[in-house]
A protein has these predicted regions:
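Conserved thiamine diphosphate
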Residues: 1-83, 92, 201
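Thiamine diphosphate
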Residues: 50-205
Length: 205
C-alpha cells in the first residue's frame, strides 16, 4: 500500500505453513473472525491470524457453523461444475468474479478456505472429485499459499480437474499506492480474472 514494499505481506502464508504445529487462519469477514476467535480460546498451540486492515463486509451465512479447519461455502450451486476457492481478503475479488461469470451464464461454487493449516482436505476432496474446473484466488504470492495447497493435493490424487491459480507474482513490488492500485499493476482484478476463467472454459466471445 502507500507505506511501500516493506509493508507488503504476501509471503506470510508460505512461511507459516512450513512451521510445525502452527495453525494458520485467514478469514474473509468479521463473522469468520468472531467465530474462530471464540474457538481459539481453547485451542492448544500457536495460531497465526492473517487479518485485513479494514472492515470487510460480512459475506458468510450467519446461520452457518464456522469451525477451525472447516471450509465455509459462501455460494453453492448444485448444478455447477466450477468451484472458486479463496482465502482471506481476496473475498471481494472472488465474489465479483462469480457475479461477472453469472452475467455470462456461468454459475460457480464460491468457498472460503479460512483455515490454511490444518487444511480441510475432506471438503477439498469432494470438490476435486465433483468439479471439472477449480480456480483459486488469493492476495498472496503464487508460491506457498492456497493455490499451492490445492495443487499439491491434486498432483497426488488420481483425479484430473482443470485447475488454475490466481495470485500475486513471485517478485517484489516497487509500486507505491493503494491496495487497489497495486492489484491493478499486478493484473489481480476481478475483470482480468473473469476473462481468464472464461478463456479456460473455452467461452466463445
Amino acid at each position: 500500500g502507500p507505506a511501500g514494499a516493506t509493508h507488503h505481506s504476501i509471503e506470510d502464508i508460505a512461511i507459516m505453513r512450513a512451521l510445525p504445529n502452527m495453525t494458520l487462519f485467514s478469514p474473509c469477514d468479521p463473522y469468520e473472525v468472531e467465530k474462530i476467535t471464540e474457538e481459539s480460546i481453547n485451542h492448544q498451540g500457536p495460531i497465526y491470524f492473517r487479518l485485513a486492515k479494514k472492515g470487510e463486509p460480512i459475506i458468510s451465512n450467519q446461520e452457518s457453523k464456522i469451525e477451525l479447519g472447516k471450509a465455509n461455502f459462501i455460494e453453492k450451486n448444485e448444478n455447477s461444475n466450477i468451484a472458486i476457492l479463496f482465502t482471506g481478503n481476496a473475498s471481494d475479488i472472488a465474489l465479483e468474479v462469480s457475479s461477472e461469470l453469472k452475467e455470462r451464464g456461468v454459475v460457480t461454487d464460491v468457498i472460503s478456505f479460512h483455515t490454511i493449516k490444518p487444511f480441510d482436505y475432506e471438503t477439498l476432496d469432494k470438490i476435486v472429485s465433483s468439479k471439472k474446473y477449480i480456480f483459486t484466488i488469493e492476495e498472496h504470492s503464487i508460491i506457498g499459499g492456497l493455490g499451492s495447497v490445492v495443487s499439491e493435493y491434486i498432483a497426488e490424487s488420481r483425479l484430473n480437474p482443470i485447475f488454475k491459480r490466481f495470485a500475486l507474482p513471485d517478485e517484489y513490488s516497487h509500486y507505491v499506492g493503494s491496495q487497489f492500485y497495486i492489484r491493478e499493476k499486478f493484473e489481480f482484478t476481478s475483470a482480468l480474472i473473469s476473462n481468464k476463467i472464461l478463456n479456460t472454459l473455452g467461452y466463445k466471445w
